[in-house]
């Protein structure tokens, strides 16, 4: 099924380029998207790409050339336009000595779909622009409520769902970033112990660009009673990206990652999931399937996938974990 069919519900037999007029998006195959690279230089090496990719993600230099150089060029245009608007507004308001606040890029998508790889690759590419911008990357993992809180509130089985995050803390963090405040603290998270690390933080000090990555960053929220204005996380984004793939593919990637982790991280005695290292393959497959069906699939359908149409750019992956289609919101 084409990405256009999924987003706008046109008949599957309708070619996704013909459906362009029915949608707020332009649709491109990966081959067409690659042509927008123009003369954007490749500034990463093969070894660097291997270091940046997540477990099970086969991204290589060819994928960077096909997809990420064009995306880097697009984002460069958006950042430059934002800077021009900033300068024009300052002239309009007769302001001087005002520092441009960070350009914030949000990246959303399911678990195991490759958000972290995309975020890390973009961080490196954007930081190597000729202008040498300062680029920081923060994930929403650190904004999860600590396990002790989730256990007390009986939310451990809903970890990753919107209610498991300290949304107020996320909004405070992004507000401080957009206000241009120095040395803003982002809480740290350990995937080894599967918990927020108390009193450990990443310091974000007025970057030119901030990449903010997490499964629910495009999540909307119900309007509160009484008309009180409550911002959404995405209100702070200058550009947003959704990493997409078919449910069955994400399921396969999730299970495959779980099985690989049994042979690596889970073997660490300090791992929260160490108990899974010694079970049989059959038991591990059953547990991974249950975790997917009862937690991650539900979250995808209820909370993550419905946010896809809110993204400025959608990158759709195929069965080989490589991007096959691109949808870019029209201006």
Curated annotation (Swiss-Prot):
Annotated GO MF terms: ATP binding; pantothenate kinase activity
Descriptive protein name: Pantothenate kinase
HAMAP family, per database record: Pantothen_kinase_1
Record carries keyword DNA-binding: no
Binding site for ATP: 109-116
Cysteine disulfide partners in this protein: none
Protein's cellular compartments: Cytoplasm
Family stated for the protein in its record: Belongs to the prokaryotic pantothenate kinase family.
Organism: Rhizobium leguminosarum bv. trifolii (strain WSM2304)
InterPro entries given in the database record: P-loop_NTPase (IPR027417), PanK (IPR004566), PRK/URK (IPR006083)
